[in-house]
Amino acid sequence: MNTENALLPWGLTRLQQFLSSHNVNPLNQLPHWLNDYFSKNHFSQPRKRADKGHVYLIGAGPGDAELLTIKAHRLIQQADVVMFDWLVNPDIIKMIPRHVERVFVGKKCGRHSMQQADICQLMVEVALTGKNIVRLKGGDPAIFARAAEECDMLAQHQIDFAIVPGITAASGASAYAGIPLTHRECAQSVRFITAHLKSVKSATGELNSSIEEPNWQALVAGANASACSNNRETLVFYMGLKRIDIIMQRLRTHGLPESTPVAVIDQASTAQQKVCIGTVKNIAQQVTEQKFQGPAVTIVGEVVNRRHVVNLSLLSQSVNGVSEKA
């Protein structure tokens, strides 16, 4: 590993290589303002390994690689190790420099490659060797990404860390599907709900997730406000594709009208994005017929009827137009 290159700001490695190949001393030839920016340590002194590395919990966004933030990109370039989930776009993984170690710690419902406790332990072990780690997560690390558990573990071992936000799945799905999450005429607020519930052991030792189910009555009360009111609440379910039939049943059972509009956005903001528009009554059957793969975001509420089909070709030719079924 070239420690000099590892320290250069992103995009300037090639400049340093070019100058070196022409026997040019970059410290003498660069303009004084750029010379000051680099400082001689970038070229003359190898980086000293700290006793403990730092950890950056970074959100990779909802799917489209171009939605990665500039700060996230810079920190990825400067990392010693990048640990990433299965939700991270492969195009973002390609941005990781070759000298940076890549560790896949993906977790997917029903197909765990690593338990959360093992991921936390691995981060600590690597950081204690003095390496700086980027922990790359899909969406935003603070929203249903279990960042709090990782922060707890790092704090226990007195390892410094920082969090870099990413565009959460709900925002990405909303924008790329043309569905507002709030609307001054019909939705004053929005609520994010995880459908991937924590399993709890009963007294007999059996796993039971029903104890951790959301307060359906409260959800329906917010979403089912008076039709002439703008106080209704938009409901957004994360990771609910496999449970969409149960989710719709729960909403109906607690009083949400079957005619309430629902949108399911599959693989939002990627080239594989699909959008299905339906109602509480029929949306589960529709997404089954369309063979959605996930991850998917489900939006419930009047805002779905305020949808506009956006021209995604204005953003990228790699993102397909949406498919609709009313």
Task: Locate each region found by the language model.
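Short hydrophobic/aromatic-enriched beta-strand-loop microsegments
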Residues: 100-107, 158-162, 181-191, 255-264
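Class I S-adenosyl-L-methionine
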Residues: 1-59, 70-167, 172, 325
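Short, glycine-rich nucleotide/cofactor-binding loops
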Residues: 57-67, 238
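Class I SAM-dependent methyltransferase SAM-binding "motif I" and its flanking Rossmann-like core
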Residues: 140-231, 274-277
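Alpha-helix N-cap/loop-to-helix initiation residues
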Residues: 65, 112, 143-144, 244, ...
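A contiguous loop/helix-start segment that scaffolds small-molecule binding in enzyme catalytic cores
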Residues: 2-47, 52-55, 131-133, 197-326
